[in-house]
């Protein structure tokens, strides 16, 4: 087991960034049966998805998201994209992780803005999922927000399960 440190910035979400990761994977001796584990937010996910999908014609990968947006949305489905010649998200593919490990306790350490960004994506997913999905989202989020509190750990777990189940339904249809 080895670790590759990778900067989570738009400047690394490029073909050159993917190439750097591929070279590191090769230097570590990763083989066709190896598994890439990615821990981070959306940029890390995008680069890891593309790299694992093309390394030796595709190796399994596992994802542990660290942002609310990734926990509530992008950790399933496997959609990725990178920037090319300054054009955002020009190249991409779909290569789902073999497993997503979501630890919602990480959400408690995020700034409010980062949590709200995740909730914004979640409400969009639930709205598209229909009235029952949106009502459940509101039941989980509104009580805490009305009183200026953060979601409890239990509510965050329930919200995450709910939103990912709604998204899973979309992916499977």
Predicted features by range, described:
Residues 22, 138, 164-168:
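Amphipathic, well-packed alpha-helical segments that form the structural scaffold of globular domains
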Residues 30, 34-51:
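Glycine/serine-rich anion-binding loops at beta->alpha junctions
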């Amino acid at each position: 087991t080895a670790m590759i440190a990778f900067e989570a910035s738009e400047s690394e979400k490029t073909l050159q960034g993917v190439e750097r990761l591929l070279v590191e994977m090769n230097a570590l001796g990763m083989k066709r049966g190896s598994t890439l584990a990615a821990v981070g937010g959306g940029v890390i996910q995008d680069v890891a998805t593309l790299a694992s999908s093309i390394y030796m014609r595709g190796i399994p990968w596992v994802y542990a998201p660290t942002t609310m947006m990734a926990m509530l949305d992008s950790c399933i489905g496997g959609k990725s994209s990178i920037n090319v010649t300054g054009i955002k998200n020009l190249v991409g593919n779909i290569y789902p992780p073999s497993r997503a490990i979501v630890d919602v306790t990480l959400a408690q350490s995020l700034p409010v803005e980062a949590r709200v960004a995740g909730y914004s994506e979640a409400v969009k997913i639930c709205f598209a999922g229909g009235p029952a999905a949106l009502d459940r989202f509101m039941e989980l989020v509104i009580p805490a927000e009305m009183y200026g509190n953060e979601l409890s750990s239990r509510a965050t777990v329930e919200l995450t399960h709910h939103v990912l189940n709604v998204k899973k339904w979309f992916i499977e249809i």
